């Protein structure tokens, strides 16, 4: 599922010129910033490596950026890979044996590591040792390699898929939350200065409130609105051109697009608002379950249009009102579902 409001990173997201390099430049996630600052300063004062860190939460909120910031703050090299890219134990061994003291190893989608890889990772994280088997059959022997003190930073959008043994080895687990409108305005204002865009306060607010609480989406929309302004002969991005461009992009007043409407209307039209199972929804919409759970559902839940229950997905009265559809008579049972299972 790829669209203008997808929180997943795309090849067209040019983030390097505007990506913050240090904690003081990073906007939002205030508690995480403050805690990281303490942990980093404490580790440096003791001349120790920073504890292994796990960032989790919806995509597009800054997990990769924070990992790079940590690398800059502690003065180590930044090495990046992803769970799906590490196919064999040898792949992981090659990465680990090339690390230096205080390096940061960032593993995106860490929940997708297979069990064999995880088992090699455990002693590397705990004891900074790598146990590998050299040779085959009767000639095989175990070799222990000492690794430098490094910091592993994992990132995941699916914390529940991370195995307990791996999760427990992260000394600093941190959840990233959706941004509010004011925080997104700060992100947009900072980016507009770096990109030399004349962005008014009203234009910034219009883009921010339709960005699904996600900086990556806000920055993507800013670039597209800049295009509309340029073609329309406008020198600045104000509320008028922002509203025009966002409507052309089919982004509504609260940040929903056609995919969200398809999702909500399917449940409303076919199941009177639910409950309905996620597999049924995925099959009907011809979408992958993971795409729905990672791209569409988190924001709908965040703004109160969708609820997950033990019996399936249920859209709320607020969702019917936003769709301008009559609320079914039995809608009151949507909330009884929760009361019965609390």
UniProtKB/Swiss-Prot annotation:
InterPro entries: AAA+_ATPase, AAA_lid_4, DNA_helicase_Holl-junc_RuvB, P-loop_NTPase, RuvB-like_N, RuvB_C, WH-like_DNA-bd_sf, WH_DNA-bd_sf. Mg(2+) binds at residue 64. It comes from the Bacteria. Residues 1-179 are annotated as: Large ATPase domain (RuvB-L). The RuvA-RuvB-RuvC complex processes Holliday junction (HJ) DNA during genetic recombination and DNA repair, while the RuvA-RuvB complex plays an important role in the rescue of blocked DNA replication forks via replication fork reversal (RFR). RuvA specifically binds to HJ cruciform DNA, conferring on it an open structure. The RuvB hexamer acts as an ATP-dependent pump, pulling dsDNA into and through the RuvAB complex. RuvB forms 2 homohexamers on either side of HJ DNA bound by 1 or 2 RuvA tetramers; 4 subunits per hexamer contact DNA at a time. Gene3D superfamilies: 1.10.8.60, P-loop containing nucleotide triphosphate hydrolases (3.40.50.300), Winged helix-like DNA-binding domain superfamily/Winged helix DNA-binding domain (1.10.10.10). SMART domains: AAA. It catalyses: ATP + H2O = ADP + phosphate + H(+). DNA binds at residues 289, 308, 313. GO terms for molecular function: ATP binding; ATP hydrolysis activity; four-way junction DNA binding; four-way junction helicase activity. Residues 253-342 are annotated as: Head domain (RuvB-H). GO terms for biological process: DNA recombination; DNA repair. Keywords: ATP-binding, Cytoplasm, DNA damage, DNA recombination, DNA repair, DNA-binding, Hydrolase, Nucleotide-binding. This is Holliday junction branch migration complex subunit RuvB.
């Amino acid at each position: 599922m790829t669209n203008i409001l997808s929180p997943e990173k795309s090849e067209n997201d040019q983030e390097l010129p505007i990506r913050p390099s240090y904690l003081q430049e990073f906007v939002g996630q205030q508690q995480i910033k403050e805690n990281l600052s303490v942990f980093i300063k404490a580790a440096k004062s003791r001349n120790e490596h920073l504890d292994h860190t796990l960032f989790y939460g919806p995509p597009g909120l800054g997990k990769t950026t924070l990992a790079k910031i940590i690398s800059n703050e502690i003065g180590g090299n930044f090495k990046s890979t992803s769970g799906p890219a590490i196919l064999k134990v040898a792949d992981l061994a090659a990465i680990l044996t090339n690390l230096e003291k205080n390096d940061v190893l960032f593993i995106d989608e860490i929940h997708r590591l297979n069990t064999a890889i995880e088992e090699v990772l455990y002693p590397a994280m705990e004891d900074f040792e790598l146990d590998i088997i050299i040779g085959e059959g009767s000639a095989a022997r175990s070799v222990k390699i000492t690794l430098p003190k490094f910091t592993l930073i994992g990132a995941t959008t699916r914390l529940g898929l991370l195995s307990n043994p791996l999760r427990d080895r992260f000394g600093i687990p941190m959840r990233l939350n959706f941004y509010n409108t004011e925080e997104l305005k700060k992100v947009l204002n900072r980016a507009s200065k770096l990109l030399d865009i004349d962005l008014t306060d009203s234009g910034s607010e219009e883009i921010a409130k339709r960005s699904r609480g996600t900086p990556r989406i806000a920055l993507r929309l800013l670039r597209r609105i800049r295009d509309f302004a340029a073609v329309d002969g406008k020198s600045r991005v104000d509320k008028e051109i922002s509203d025009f461009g966002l409507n052309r992009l089919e982004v509504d007043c609260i940040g929903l697009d056609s995919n969200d409407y398809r999702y909500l209307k399917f449940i409303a039209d076919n199941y009177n608002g639910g409950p309905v199972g996620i597999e049924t929804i995925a099959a009907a919409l011809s979408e992958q379950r993971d795409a729905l759970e990672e791209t569409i559902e988190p924001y709908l839940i965040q703004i109160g249009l969708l609820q997950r229950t033990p019996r399936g997905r249920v859209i709320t009265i607020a969702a019917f009102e936003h769709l301008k559809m009559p609320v079914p008579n039995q809608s009151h049972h949507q909330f009884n579902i929760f009361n019965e299972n609390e």
